[in-house]
């Protein structure tokens, strides 16, 4: 069941899937290892029947752990391989298995709160720039042009070009944004490792009169450019820098051959109470189509430890 090929062979398969999932890339496993987690590369089948699953172990209390396949398994038939992953997870001694299937859901799975967003908005970059602009909300187009007139400058750097000062600026802006919007963020160490080691990262920054007013972390993998994280300051918000930053990232992605631009999470049906409600209106203005995945599912092997885990998670979130 464990994959015996090369990293290049792994990525060739994952990146070759429609709307390729970077969370199943070989390098995402390497990044998870750098965080101290155990990972496995699982695979089976030939050609059209081939399936891949990057499995990550997340620690629980003591020596207990659960195994997760983020945004996967990938391939056809994924429902059959979801069952294989669940069986394998049980054999490894996991307390439960967690999957985020692309399509169908195995029986006896418990639908839980999303880890990765189950609703997202995707823009088809095969259209011309004028066509992309024409399907945007008029206010979004206006803000893009306004930002250009105000003199906002957008620049991008690959993961191996990002400086320590830019990392510090990202942390400052993301912390400010999280506090303003009352959302949680990863640790500073997490961002530092991600931005400087994951090879599909591009860090965008928008400057106005020499000051950084907005930044965004993009991930380009396979046929898709993902807008993973965004941050901005309230100062000089009148120059509408995040709008021009997004537009420039879309144009850049189109010009280097990406087919899709994924906004990585929106609220379902524009729900006003969803955690992503605050950014959904902004993302919706750029057009595109809403795509819905089944969600995140747990398959517990031992009921009591799983019940205790869910209770502790609920208490922690309510504090």
Regions found by a protein language model. Name each.
Residues 83-86, 192, 196-307:
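Aromatic (often tryptophan-rich) hydrophobic motifs at membrane interfaces
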Residues 70-107:
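A gly/proline- and charged-residue-enriched helix-loop-helix capping module
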Residues 103-153, 265-319:
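Terminal substrate-recognition subdomain of acyl/acetyltransferases
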Residues 37-39, 91-94, 255-258:
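Short, high-confidence coil segments that cap the C-terminus of an alpha-helix
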Residues 61-70:
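N-terminal cap/recognition module
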Residues 2-62, 101-106, 111-123, 127-238:
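A conserved beta-strand-loop-helix scaffold within acyl/acetyltransferase catalytic domains
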């Amino acid at each position: 069941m464990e994959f015996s090929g090369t990293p290049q062979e792994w990525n060739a398969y994952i990146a070759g899937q429609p709307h390729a999932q970077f969370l199943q890339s070989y390098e995402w496993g390497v990044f998870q290892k750098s965080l101290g987690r155990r990972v496995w590369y699982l695979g089976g089948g030939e050609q059209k029947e081939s399936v891949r699953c990057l499995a990550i172990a997340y620690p629980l209390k003591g020596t207990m752990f659960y195994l997760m396949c983020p945004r996967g398994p990938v391939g056809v038939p994924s429902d059959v391989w979801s069952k294989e992953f669940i069986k394998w997870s049980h054999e490894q001694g996991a307390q439960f298995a967690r999957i985020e299937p692309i399509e169908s859901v195995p029986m006896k799975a418990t639908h839980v709160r999303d880890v990765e967003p189950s609703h997202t908005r995707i823009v088809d970059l095969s259209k011309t720039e004028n066509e992309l602009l024409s399907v945007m909300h008029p206010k979004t187009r206006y803000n893009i042009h306004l930002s250009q007139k105000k003199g906002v400058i957008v620049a991008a750097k690959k993961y191996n070009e990002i400086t320590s000062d830019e990392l510090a600026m990202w942390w400052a802006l993301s912390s400010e944004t999280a506090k303003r919007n009352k959302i949680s963020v990863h640790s500073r160490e997490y961002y530092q490792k991600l931005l400087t080691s994951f090879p599909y990262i591009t860090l965008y920054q928008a400057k106005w009169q020499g000051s950084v007013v907005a930044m965004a972390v993009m991930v380009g993998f396979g046929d898709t450019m993902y807008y993973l994280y965004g941050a901005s300051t309230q100062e000089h918000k009148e120059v509408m820098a995040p709008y021009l930053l997004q537009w420039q990232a879309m144009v850049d992605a189109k010009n280097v051959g990406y087919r899709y631009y994924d906004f990585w999470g929106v609220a379902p049906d524009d729900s006003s109470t969803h955690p992503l409600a605050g950014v959904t209106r902004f993302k919706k203005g750029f057009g595109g189509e809403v795509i819905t995945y089944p969600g995140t599912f747990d398959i517990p092997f031992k009921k009591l430890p799983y019940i205790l885990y869910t209770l502790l998670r609920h208490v922690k979130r309510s504090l």
